[in-house]
Amino acid sequence: MKELIKMDQFTYWFIPVSIKNKEYVIYKLIDGKVKREGKIGSVANIHPLTLQSVQGLNDVERVELLKDFKKYQSRPEYLALESIREDNENPINKYAYILVGGYMLTKQAANSDKAFETAMQALQWLNTTDFYEAPASTVYHDAHKGGLLKHTLNVVDCLADLIDSEPFNSVDIGDALVSACCHDWCKIRMYESYMRNVKNEKTGQWEKVQAYKQKDERFIALGHGVSSMYLANRCFSLTLECAAAIRWHMGEYNVAQNEMNELHQCNEQFPLVQLLQFADRLSITKYAVAEEK
């Protein structure tokens, strides 16, 4: 993670309002100094590559804007959205950018430099766990070393494909990224590897292959979604919608009968709840299709 250029060094703030299906990002431009004085800043949609669609700026202001955007390109918020479109980036770095930048994009963080410290502390905690090496399951999907990280990034990709579509285009981008990054944290330290005998269909010989099982002493005390929400809320200040999305991301697959009403109410009230459910299922479906080929 690069050294943070603090917001008080910017004349203009860049607030993403659309990922545009991962092709480019549309930003809302805010005059940072005016905003800090409590007034309404100037607003414009800009294309990050050209900045040509910004209206109402003179040549001096346009030069200042370009300088600010170049500085902004080292900020976690920018790196998070760029990482979504980078398929060849190191997956651990990609996840770090998306988690940290995603949290800094949330309304409760409000581009606060304090939010950067909070997110970095969460990363430091993750580094003490097996998150980056754990499987996503024992058999159903991504049941291999690093599978949990791979699945999480796939969910982020699916979410980015959906978020600009109705009815999800009102969802806060930061909340969406944080919920995707944290939705399966309950699986941290859940599995252990062992060697399993498997018959090679080509040679007919039995071979030992690495497999995973749930640790005997490990159980999810609060349930799948609630456990992930609990861990995420220990690290971040979550909005109710973000917390609900993590809590209910399994949809009807992990809900008691007497909880169905609460699930349906959250689906109706919070678009992010359904968005994360769809992204999670789409990721698993894509995995299954790829395995069949």
Residue ranges and their predicted role:
Residues 1-3, 7, 293:
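Short intrinsically disordered terminal tails
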Residues 58-59, 63-208:
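Acidic/His-rich, divalent-metal-binding segments that scaffold phosphate/diphosphate chemistry
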